[in-house]
């Protein structure tokens, strides 16, 4: 199939346990991809194919699947809902044209729903809304619609209404066609009847149809005027065209309801994917960037098979078949045997086997074109975010930017023979997940794993043990503290070394002060005359910048420091670049304490759900953890508490929360910002670091 208007690249995303993976399973059943529907409760779903996913009933990696509906090709990505795996959602949104946001009918707009929604807004991804689990106790479709409006600040365009609720939920009313779809209790998606709207819903259905038409027609002024002034109702085709335009422009979000688990309402969502979500040619084309500056060049990757190749590697995965590179093709074609250029490395790669993925199963293909999401087997030097292009037309697509890890653990193999095996395994895992980092402690020789949260690292350790057979000793989690300064000072430092023959000499006079939050390290020279020759300024900058990696208080990286070199001294024979670099390093060590060096700790944005009768206990516990409560929202099933809490106070929190709430509490957290440590905490952290270093 080469008609790009019949392509839909979509993602399914939501909060943990809202029913994304179950919804994907139902879609695959309806489109004929699978014949027996899997169930997350027993770990048999198609897209959750890792052992860790099947056991925990959560989606960790974004599984890609291709299927067909009404003569349209759907490339679907099922994304994780847990906040520790938000990187997968971000990575998927980067290559999608549309999406389905799944919300739990009883839980409503939950913490990760907000995060995913924010990312989708930033990526300008058109979305449908599916309010799922309306067969559940406490489900309330209209409450969730209100939350979408009030919490997310989005405009839901209600397309279906529930017939019955909780155990009485039997089907939906199609607001536009004014027909009822009623399923029997067999659980089979095809066992439904199209009926007249129940008598007690006729008025409500008519009211929602009027709202739908008025909202949709805001996209076409002529139709709106004819409707309001002359009472002329537009055709269904015109209404659908307006809905499609408004959906593409994020003016509103077509909203559907149902129960994926009970197979009710899914066909209408698939119809909506085809009717309202954009094809690859209808979204803004990907901008091209300057590889040196990262700035947009003003050129774009035109979505056409006739253009030179422009493709983005958005995911690396190592499975039982070997290394897979997932690729979104934006322009041109890619064929088996082609040679492509990796613009990030300047090296060429030969395209070997190309496959379409159905979760962890592969179907080999010979070629792909603009609009396709495929995987290539065995690419050697490609990483996430790299651009693959025609060697004769080099270009760079907008890169992916990933958050820094906030938590780390030390690991070592239980037996000596495991070191090499662990090194190979970790290398593959880092390639797969850019938010997972590794480094070696130079003094202790320990391997340090860094990630986005406890669950993130817990899963990584589990993969090392189970998938790669590496038995590990795992240290306690460590917080990624940072250091900074609080005062501006003026200082001078001289480096002088004489040991026969030519020596070393460098003198620098400098000002050091706190930089703006998020500025990192900035350096400038205002030296006039030749007291510090211009060719040595980069060496001074390099010396200071190198010391930013290890602060003076406890060896943590230093943030937001501004250095100005304004004068100094020079010796015609003994001065050199290395002498000035050493001087800058000594200056950093000398001046940081004088400039009020301060320890910073990561603060997490924490979102807790608790039954109402445990609110006091939960807030009291968060206060004891040095938390600052920002917001409290009462819902029908409990209370959501939002606040900022230091990461160091959140280890093991889920166990405490479950105990306090008799197992009914839930929480999520994501990094918010760095904040100064209280003195007593800073003193303890510094003492702990010194003690650990003494043991090395």
Swiss-Prot record:
Cell compartments where the protein resides? Cytoplasm
Name the GO terms of the biological process aspect. Answer: ribosome disassembly
Disulfide links within the chain:
none
* Coiled coil start-end: none
The UniProt entry lists the main location of this chain as cytoplasm
Name the positions where GTP binds: 14-21, 78-82, 132-135
Where does the tr-type G domain start and stop, copy by copy? Answer: 5-281
Query: Which GO terms of the cellular component aspect does the record hold?
Result: cytoplasm
* One GO MF term attached to the UniProt entry: GTP binding
* InterPro entries in the cross-refs: EFG_II, EFG_III, EFG_III/V, EFG_IV, EFG_V, EFG_V-like, EFTu-like_2, G_TR_CS
**Signal sequence range:** none
Per UniProt, the keywords (alphabetical) are:
Cytoplasm, Elongation factor, GTP-binding, Nucleotide-binding, Protein biosynthesis
Function description: Catalyzes the GTP-dependent ribosomal translocation step during translation elongation. During this step, the ribosome changes from the pre-translocational (PRE) to the post-translocational (POST) state as the newly formed A-site-bound peptidyl-tRNA and P-site-bound deacylated tRNA move to the P and E sites, respectively. Catalyzes the coordinated movement of the two tRNA molecules, the mRNA and conformational changes in the ribosome.
Q: Return the similarity comment.
A: Belongs to the TRAFAC class translation factor GTPase superfamily. Classic translation factor GTPase family. EF-G/EF-2 subfamily.
What is this protein's name? Elongation factor G 2
- Native organism is Vibrio parahaemolyticus serotype O3:K6 (strain RIMD 2210633)
